[in-house]
Amino acid sequence: MTQHKRRVAFAATVAGIALLAAGCASGTAEDTSGSTTTESATETVEGRIAVAYEGGVAVLDPETLEVVDEFASEEFIRLNTFGDGKTVAVTTSAGFQMLDTSEPALTDLVFEATTAGHVVSHEGNTVLFDDGTGTSTIVATDAFADGYDALPETTTYTADEPHHGVSIVLEDGELVTTLSDRSGAVALHAHEDHWDEEAMSADCPGIHGEGTAADEAVIFGCENGALLYADGEFVSFTAPDEYGRMGNAFVSETSPIVVGDYKNDPDAEGYLLNAVTLIDIAAQTYEVVDLPDEVQYTFRDIARGPGDLAYILASDGQIHVLAPETGELTDAYPVVEAWEGPVEWQDAHPAIKVADDIAYVTEPAANSVHAVDLTTGEIVSSVELDHTPNEIAIS
């Protein structure tokens, strides 16, 4: 596989740079929450499951899958892990609404966004990206440790133009974010009233998705391969096909190997995919592995789990276990009935999320959610909901 390395200067001006000082942060001190802290809030319940359905969201117990509570919302919402063990960011037309899964309560706290997009949590910071303005809002991941009385202080960075982008803050405070023309990414260091550029690459057309692997290596998907940021430099990986799109990275912060989705036909109908990308960030190698015909999946159907293995919830109804080091499928666990790919990406179809050794799998055709022990393949609990599950998130 071809790879090339490049470092490019970045001279574009930055619009809407926010001061980092607390007094100039964009968070408001005004109390806008309908959920106040109570004595019971000190006994935080972590790891609950949020399941979106048409017109609302349910909170499930992670062991029994019992529905703890349900909350009305908009017709279509998305769910994003905030990173603190209890909060889920619910994507609505108003922005990012905070769901407290511990209480539980769908609070009135909303980080306003014109087009709420990706949410990335890493090393104590959570970044909310507004596609409609190109603004990254940086929030301390533990901001709601004492309750949801008010929106916390934030820091913001706004790109030159609105775009469907994503950002991450590294352990040293460095912000890595997509370029506004979606041609690549830039790494920035924050100062009191500006951001200094560390590195930039414009070698990633159609940049989409983000993941952080071992040694804090950040990977992005491109329409011609992938883009890696590590040790202050960008490295580009070129796909074997002229159009070879990786749109999502499935990573483990203890593994040097990234598993990505892969599409090589821009005109293909539907959303089912039949190959994966394997990127070894240590060896800096890139490989595309074709899967058996029956192993087809969408962007919701791959997760990393025990042993840093990859788990693919395929359209044949099984979870297929993939060894990233070899690209081989080593096992398969029947979980749901066989299913067809969605007509639109927003349509409800099976999804998988993993916490420790347990995979949580939605089965929209049966209005069900299943918990699967990935070390044995055993379904340890199931629940039938009153609604059709769509997206799922682990708090």
Features from the language model and the residues they span:
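Bacterial signal peptide processing site
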Residues: 25-28
